[in-house]
Amino acid sequence: MINSLLTRVFGSRNERQLRQLTRLVTQINALEPTIEKLSDAELQAKTPEFKQRLAAGESLDKILPEAFAVCREASRRVLGMRHYDVQLIGGMVLHLGKIAEMRTGEGKTLVATLPVYLNALQGEGVHVVTVNDYLARRDAAQMGKLYNWLGLSVGVVYPGMPHSDKREAYGSDITYGTNNEFGFDYLRDNMALSRADRYQRTLHYAIVDEVDSILIDEARTPLIISGPADESPELYIRVNRIVPQLTKQESEEGEGDFWVDEKGKQVHLSEAGMGHAEELLLQAGILENAEDGLYAAQNLSVVHHLNAALRAHAIYQRDVDYIVRDGEVVIVDEFTGRTLSGRRWSDGLHQAVEAKEGVPVQRENQTLASITFQNLFRMYKKLSGMTGTADTEAYEFQSIYGLEVVVIPTNRPTVRKDHPDQVFLNRKGKFNAVLADIEDCAKRGQPVLVGTTSIETSEMLSEHLRKAGVKHEVLNAKQHEREATIVANAGQPGAVTIATNMAGRGTDIVLGGSLESEYHALGEDATEDARFKIKTDWQRRHDAVKAAGGLHIIGTERHESRRIDNQLRGRAGRQGDPGSSRFYLSLEDNLMRIFASDWVQKAMRMMGMKEDDVIEDRLVSRQIEKAQRKVEAHNFDIRKNLLDFDDVNNDQRKVIYAQRDELLDAESVKDNVDGIRGDVIYDLVARFVPPNSVDEQWDVKGLEATLESELGVTLSLTDMVRTQEEIDAEQIAAKVQAAVDAHFAEKEAAVGNDTMRALEKHVMLTVLDQGWKEHLAKMDYLRQGIYLRGYAQKQPKQEYKKEAFELFSEMLENVKREVIHLLARVRIRSEEEVAELEEQERLHAQARLMASQFQHQDVGGYGTDEEAAQVQSGNAPVPVSQVTRDEPKVGRNDPCPCGSGKKYKHCHGQLS
């Protein structure tokens, strides 16, 4: 009550911030007459002037009014677009490192030019992050004209571009790209073996377009660079034949072999199902011993494959969760409806789906490097974002990213009519009403956009409309190549467009059709008469559509998130245009079936509702919104939990990447190697000759044998121990140290200082990377089983932190040992020996090629020749992309970032 009273008196925090920023807008507008009088050359000269002022110590905030005024005037001259006052406010919000919520059609792309120009003046690089490559290239091309005119360089990064071009793009003042590309480039940079192979500079400032999609929707999926593991995918094919023989039960207490937890997207075997599955696996020869049981330790791999196959069959649906294209299973993004080429599900799920669909099963992947978007974007010194729908997730933005959401008022009042939801008993009744609404709009010449949650639904509606003779377009992951054309025509009079969520973002639907597209089709050489005719025809269509009520939005199902529903609604009513929206629901929809209260369904059935009967009731709408809030809270918990675990990995990642940076920057790592060698020898001697021990406890022969086998050093210690009475463990350690040092000095003398320094650096980087890769695999296994600690009354997160620290310390010790072992045993060959070895390898390669081309296949027990061929020909996954940030250097006497409480030099700085 007090908060409500204070808000009425002083206004909400959002209103107070807008009032403060409006004062700056007044200053910018006051500068406009002066800026307008400047010639082009004088206006362009402002950029170097601003840079000089910043170098002299002036702040960005101080030059903001003038820089914004310059950018606005340059935009008017170059692009023919002048920023509105509300767009200036949006630009200031972005500069302040906050999220600007701006409705569809308010010109977010133009808004971003203001803070991008201002922050690019510092020369440290600005990243503009978009949701797909098309938008990145489009915006870089369109807005690049403005930035280039103002004297700033612009680059765009995309998958597969040449290394030199990508380095140049990252060296530009402004770089456009997708969140995936920036993230994968960061990971790639931290796998590079030389500075010259790296792309990025420091992570200075990022503006994230459609920030809710990237930082919320995609936060549950970490970016992973992976390589194929050694395990054969054949077991997925064999287990896949068994799953169709298992029976699904309707609930946990029902009869059958397994039940599905749709909320958690998991499948659970019943008691009977375990026995039945065990029997089938024994018959197929997958389980070897009936006495061991399915859950015996040696069968855990089979359980993993069985669970993956059950999820593939019972939960993941073709044309909903994925499509099959050119013999590959391609994931469909549940939030955007776009295909995610190059992305693969983890934990064997992708292989299980491939086996289910009968396409070549690729090998399971091993993680080489990974990071979540949460930890990636939190590394930027300053982060901001813009979207049309952020306010519903304001708490998450604030709690995880420290980003405040500021709602920017529209330039013109929104006049869109949002009609109440209509709820039907079943899907048939719902779709009858949807089809009737579409046909009515088409007859009246009102364009309609029909939003669906799956490809399957969009194609089903398309089939019904085709039979009814209604001309329409379908936009889903299968037709994504035609997206720009379909969206450009979606505002034509009477146009019917059926779309998955992918139509919800990026491109405005203009009433009457896209005038820009028609101008572009004419070409630059078109006469003024031709352009005038196009404009006249468009204006006539535009007015006709406005008279018919503007764009009408039909939602065929509520999404789990209110934000996605709001995005669909937001396609209509842009810039004060008329428009309308309505959602059609049924009790069979996933959201209603899984999350809505049972009493809603019971009440509707008790009322004797028939198939085509409809309910429009606020109480039902409130229940639907309550269900959505439940799902949003559930998904937030998942993302928060992911972050809690990844923060442990992130601390370790920072340590490893900081050490890699030190190694890459160092002229020589000889001091590092010498220090590590001392530690390794001390530990080695202590294994056989413990400190403060008597000679009866010593294993001198074991020490001699280990020195020979692990370090290639022949040293006789037995005689020394036998002949010297006063000898102790320290003297033995000193003798071993001297012998190993001499061995290394001899090796260096043979190959030369420069070669040895290069070899040391290469070995340290290679071994560190291999150790980190193996450590990531161990961390994955630890994480998968950590929840079982809860049964022992232990906190899984605390146990994860503790065991992850132990694994990390063990990994660093192993890296130190491996570096010294490799350097001690490496042999530098002469040029003649190298030539001979290369010739031998060439002959071996030819023999392997002949063997693979003419390999004879043994008769399989259960598989077909086709399935065997699929296993043999599985394509290795294409590695995906990365981003770099130089963290503040950790001093050797500073506390270690891993949280152990030790000094860095005594903990994870030991390699340094």
Curated annotation (Swiss-Prot):
Family: Belongs to the SecA family.
Cofactor(s) this protein requires: Zn(2+)
Name of the coding gene: secA
Gene3D superfamilies: Helical scaffold and wing domains of SecA, P-loop containing nucleotide triphosphate hydrolases, SecA, preprotein cross-linking domain
Record's keyword terms, sorted: ATP-binding, Cell inner membrane, Cell membrane, Cytoplasm, Membrane, Metal-binding, Nucleotide-binding, Protein transport, Translocase, Translocation, Transport, Zinc
GO BP: any one term: intracellular protein transmembrane transport
Name under which the protein is recorded: Protein translocase subunit SecA
Positions contributing to ATP binding: 87, 105-109, 508
Uppermost EC category: translocase
